[in-house]
Amino acid sequence: GTINGVGIKYNITDFVGSLLISNDAGTGTLDAASANTGIGHEVFDDLTTGDDNTGLGYQALTVLTTGSSNTAVGSAALDANTTGDSNTAVGRCALSANTSGANNIGIGFGAAKTTTTGIANVAVGGNALKLNETGCYNIAIGKDTMEANTTGCYNVAVGYLALDANTTAHNNTAVGDASLSANTTGYINVAIGKSAMAANTTGQGNVAIGGNALDANTTGAANVAIGCSAMSANTTCGYNVGIGFCALTTQVDGGVNNTAVGSCSLKLNSTGDLNVGLGYAAMEANTTAGANVAVGAYASRCNTEGGDNVSMGYAALYTNTTGGKNTAIGCVALCSNTTASNNSAFGVQALKTNTTGTTNTAVGSCALDANQTADSNTAVGSSALSSNTTGSSNTSIGAFSMNDSTTGSNNLAVGRGALDANTTGAENTALGMNALSANITTSCNTAIGKGAMLVAVNGDNTAVGVNALVASNSGYTNTAVGQRAGCTTTSGYANTYIGRTAIGSAADNNDEVVVGAGLTGKGDQTAFIGGSSGAYNAENNAAWTTTSDRRIKKNIVDNNIGLEKINKIKVRNFEYKTKDEITELSADSVINKKGIQLGVIAQEIEEILPEVVKVQSTGVKAVNPDNITWYLVNAIKELKKEIEE
């Protein structure tokens, strides 16, 4: 029937369970349609068999024929839909061009307005997905979101102007006002945050989370930016990671394969490549340098152009600008370095104050802590070389070794406390715990062994053995080899002690030589060599004399043999064979003397006086001329007697 010119149809024979109110109520055949509700001018005008549809508004679902389960609320909502099913359109012109597309939702003025056959799209907001035609499985929430999309599928846009310019790109996610707003064909991007990736056009595979993250990116691909303004200036660079507030914020179009994690990390990077910055402000000032690794708050913060550096720890390599190939691991390690290169620092405060010194290695807490400009030092151990400032080419291994050295160079110290007190002394060698530990300014000492030259303060000494020259303080040019050799000497000089506990006759002796374990010297300018009874004793520039004191001898018997033996000895002239001519002995047996020599043959002497012939380690037989001397004495006595008779 009609009420005031408005037609009302319900429960018609073939229009079961339906209600239609319109001034043009259902001119179609209404064949077998059921459970439909239509209110508005020309609603269901062409409906034939479609069921479960709801159309509210001027020309809502006006050309629907067989489509079912559609809901259209608003003027011209789903206006062109004919066979599409399960669509929901709320708002003027929402889904107005849809013909056969199904399972679409358009809420808002012009939402998904031009969609024709697209399916499973969700558009919520004025003009959301406005130009979409065949794109499928898109979600657009917010005014003008994905407004330009035509065929792009599997996109998600939430926020005003999100993915606004997208046309054909797929698999993008944009959440936040203007996020990915300029994107046209870039795909597989994720942008979350206001203006995140706002300028992106064709860049793909990017992730931007945070306000203005990757804001300027246009074609850069495979970037990850997480944090407000992270990588905000990046345009075309790819394969970078920036995580944290302002991470990689100024990188433009040159840097690739950078990783920045932490607020302001790699903040000023422009064209530097292959950098890793982890921590607050790590490598914040870097611009063009590449292949750096900075881990820790403020690590390599001031670096601009220095490449191939590794810094790990709070403020490690903090002030470095152009220095390259440095390694700093530990809190404030190498933190003062500026332009120096090829340094290695491992440990808290290692090489802390180094500025321009190069090729230094410091391993241990406070190792080379005070070094500034010195080069080529090696310090291994806590506080090793910790006071060094300008001394170069030192090697210090052991806790507190060369701890006080400042300007001394070319020293070697191995062992805890070795050369501990050295300040300016140079060219010293100390191997062993506390070796040369009291040396301050003197040079050219060599101490090998625990406690060797423990209190020495003068130079040009050599001590090899535990506690060798242990008490020597002002002595110089001394040599001691053996455990506790020269251990009683304090101020003597030019002494030589060889053998375990070989010592001088007094603490201040000079020019004394003692060779033999447990021997005590004979005084200034003497030499004492041999076993406990002594073998030789020489004084001043005199010839060697044999120790012959009756008080140290026993079993004394006469030996009157002389002339008979001496007469049998043949004195020969000869030459020594060359190395190539010696065949029966090793080449080590050669004696490098040229010309005619005078002497005896050991094998001939052995037949006469076997006791004076000894076999050396090389197999060569040698003659001891001292014993022959005593036979000569007897021979002279015999001749004298014969002459007198």
Where are these regions (language model features)?
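C-terminal intramolecular chaperone/autoprocessing and neck/assembly modules of extracellular spikes
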Residues: 1-16, 524-626, 635, 639-645
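Glycine- and small/polar-enriched repetitive beta-structure motifs of secreted/surface proteins
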Residues: 1-548
